[in-house]
């Protein structure tokens, strides 16, 4: 696929505290957060004029689904725009709490686990052709995705019966199947539920739910860009060595608990390899592929960071990527904090630091304090993120949805939209079906907008 449609869905952890004590239940916090949304959208499940979807997911987790993007840097920008939109709701909700005499700070965390052991996700979406054999795609991808956490894990201090350990991935402990149609009960690596949100005869949506939510823009770029390159190789018929794992679910935990990434995991054919070996295999094939086929600046940046991350792990010189890879950035931060204050990894102050890294409030979150201090690399710019809060991507179907919503709101017209349908709720009940996610111009939508 020369052009691919990408999308990201992030669920956020939410809490309201006053002097360190929980003040409101997650349900109550969510109600305050979404009050403004419900007042204009008459629902806690809405599409926005930038083409994105904002809603309350199971368990009172705010979720932001980006509009369809056709480039990875665009997707990073729109994912960050989702953070800013939620930060705006947070500030508004805190103001309303104060007006009602309730003291407390609301925190939104872009992470994947809470203190009670619940998990919530970051779901990646990649459009693939319908003609390919989906089971083969999954077979090749599972070993890649199990080992990919060494590139893009968000890092976590995990309290175990044997003491605290630093894990590479937050999500790894909560994955129970390789491939399945469920998302919550069994939490697979790849979700096979067939909902393309596009022409089902031409397209299929690959729904990857194994990844961690990332604060780092560069980690996000690597996560999405490396996966796109592996998909391109599969689509082009590149022969990849069989890396099928004997037990992917055991392997994903073993990889997460081994910061050296050298621990051997068993393949289905009896061989034993490390996560580093598996990633090296995919990486070297991707380098050859791009050299042969040619690649744009994004592919080259992805390959550069991919190679440097593997080198940093191999040589145990994590500082090489401490500005670019979430789990490394956070580990270095925690390590320095512990040394400075003489703390063990099990210290509550370390747990607090771990959580603060993911706080999306730019005045409180540790990641954003590091960003302001110039301690992390970037992919996008604040100006582009600000624009993406209200302007959809201009080269995908999201543009049509965004324009329709914007005009309907300006004209105070009642409307219903989803990923594929645009509908005016007037007597004629006019509906336009947009089945091609690559199409950003459509006469039928123009006519519908002009009729308002």
From Swiss-Prot:
Protein name: Pup--protein ligase
Biological processes per GO annotation: modification-dependent protein catabolic process; proteasomal protein catabolic process; protein pupylation
Residues the entry annotates as binding Mg(2+): 9, 55, 63
Gene encoding the protein: pafA
Lineage summary: Bacteria, Bacillati, Actinomycetota, Actinomycetes, Frankiales
Similarity-based family: Belongs to the Pup ligase/Pup deamidase family. Pup-conjugating enzyme subfamily.
Keyword field contains DNA repair: no
Pfam families for the chain: Pup_ligase
InterPro entries: Pup_ligase, Pup_ligase/deamidase
GO MF terms held by the record: ATP binding; ligase activity, forming carbon-nitrogen bonds; magnesium ion binding; ubiquitin-like protein transferase activity
Catalytic reaction list: ATP + [prokaryotic ubiquitin-like protein]-L-glutamate + [protein]-L-lysine = ADP + phosphate + N(6)-([prokaryotic ubiquitin-like protein]-gamma-L-glutamyl)-[protein]-L-lysine
Residues binding ATP: 53, 66, 419
EC number: 6.3.1.19
Pathway field: Protein degradation; proteasomal Pup-dependent pathway; Protein modification; protein pupylation
Note: The reaction mechanism probably proceeds via the activation of Pup by phosphorylation of its C-terminal glutamate, which is then subject to nucleophilic attack by the substrate lysine, resulting in an isopeptide bond and the release of phosphate as a good leaving group.
Enzyme active site: 57 (proton acceptor)
Swiss-Prot/TrEMBL keywords: ATP-binding, Ligase, Magnesium, Metal-binding, Nucleotide-binding, Ubl conjugation pathway
Function: Catalyzes the covalent attachment of the prokaryotic ubiquitin-like protein modifier Pup to the proteasomal substrate proteins, thereby targeting them for proteasomal degradation. This tagging system is termed pupylation. The ligation reaction involves the side-chain carboxylate of the C-terminal glutamate of Pup and the side-chain amino group of a substrate lysine.
